[in-house]
Regions:
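Conserved phosphate-binding/catalytic region of the ribokinase-like
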Residues: 1-5, 151-155, 203-312
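Glycine/charged-rich beta-loop-alpha catalytic/anionic-binding loops adjacent to active sites
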Residues: 18-28, 131, 235-245
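Short, conserved phosphate/pyrophosphate- and ester-handling motifs at nucleotide-, phospho-/glycolipid
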Residues: 44, 193, 253
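Conserved N-terminal subdomain of the carbohydrate kinase-like
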Residues: 50-133, 302-312
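Conserved beta-alpha-beta core of the PfkB/ribokinase-like small-molecule kinase fold
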Residues: 128, 134-210, 226-228
Length: 312
């Protein structure tokens, strides 16, 4: 497939507390970046694909970091500097099995996206436009921007990929459902978890088949430790998850999407795409941070060929 990935959304600073327990007792913190769309862009770039990210950041040190990190990862970054602040998320483990994330993003630079921020030439030249259900929740103008980009992709004959990515801290299911359903109907490729599919469709039935009934030709249901199921051009697929030691589950879904889309851009078939997606998601959760664990091709080869925990 000619062209690369183009995506747009909000990337934030990420403060992650060390250890396990209440945030007030944390002994140290790591600072990085995170955002679903930029995670996918970085993931595609690390797997050898071309990726472009479009978004707003503040005129602050966190905005500087985001721009440097994206470009350092080989992502083509269209960064619009805004007078508002760069958003922030704070992540800590209350218990070994409970991860808690707080967002400080209302009114942030990233939420102030407008349709004019999206370069028409970037969309026209893309192989895939990838958007998520997070950005439409940020503001009215951000929602307009997502649908503007999707319509521009349609006009140019560019494949549209949507990750439903419902965030209950950003909007209610009542407000989200019709918007997410509208996005799904405009996509050729859709990713969703079982609960997200139910949010869009209501309960009952096979989620992949029902989402495909809205128009997409490729529907992938991400189901964590259970692996994934998919309906791709009418063919059913199921792939088991790989068993790994989970360090940080955040970012696994983005790694999965990046693996699938990177292989799709490279011309791989459905089975190969899903296998890469599963492996990328598994590799990502073995690292702390949102994007630090996104794998390279050699990383995936090592994971899939490993018979023990020693690299020789």
């Amino acid at each position: 497939m000619s062209g690369g990935l183009v995506t747009l959304g909000e990337t934030m600073g990420l403060v992650a507390a060390d250890g396990i327990g209440s945030l007030e007792f944390a002994r140290g913190f790591a600072f990085g970046i995170g955002g679903a769309e930029s995670n996918v862009a970085i993931g595609v770039a690390r797997l050898g694909g071309s990726a472009t990210w479009i978004g707003r950041v503040g005129r602050d040190a966190t905005g500087d970091l985001i721009e440097r990190r994206l470009r350092g990862e080989g992502v083509r970054a269209t960064v619009i500097r805004d007078s508002s602040f760069t958003g922030l998320m704070v992540k800590h483990r209350r218990t070994a099995g409970l991860l808690h994330v707080d967002y400080h993003r209302a009114g942030s630079a990233g939420s102030r996206l407008v349709p004019a921020d999206v370069p028409a030439a970037a969309v026209r030249s893309a192989g895939i436009l990838h958007v998520t259900g997070i950005t439409p929740a940020l503001s009215g103008t951000a929602r307009e921007t997502v649908f503007h980009a999707v319509e521009a992709a349609h006009a140019a004959g560019v494949t549209v990929s949507v990750d439903v990515n419902y965030r209950s801290k950003l909007w209610s299911s009542y407000d989200a459902a019709p918007v997410l359903r509208d996005l799904v109907t405009r996509a050729q490729v859709v990713f969703a978890g079982p609960d997200e599919a139910e949010l869009v469709l209501g309960p009952g039935g096979n989620p992949a088949e029902r989402l495909a009934g809205l128009g997409p030709s490729e529907v992938v249901i991400k189901d964590g430790a259970r692996g994934c199921t998919a309906l791709i051009e009418g063919e059913r697929h199921a792939v088991k998850a790989l068993e790994v030691t989970v360090v940080d589950p955040v970012g696994a879904g983005d790694a999965f999407v990046a693996g699938y889309l990177a292989d799709r851009l490279a011309g791989a078939g459905p089975a190969a795409r899903l296998g890469t997606a599963i492996a990328a998601g598994a590799f990502a959760v073995t690292f702390p941070g949102d994007c630090e664990g996104l794998p390279t091709r050699p990383d995936l080869e090592s994971l899939l060929s490993a018979t023990d925990n020693v690299s020789r």
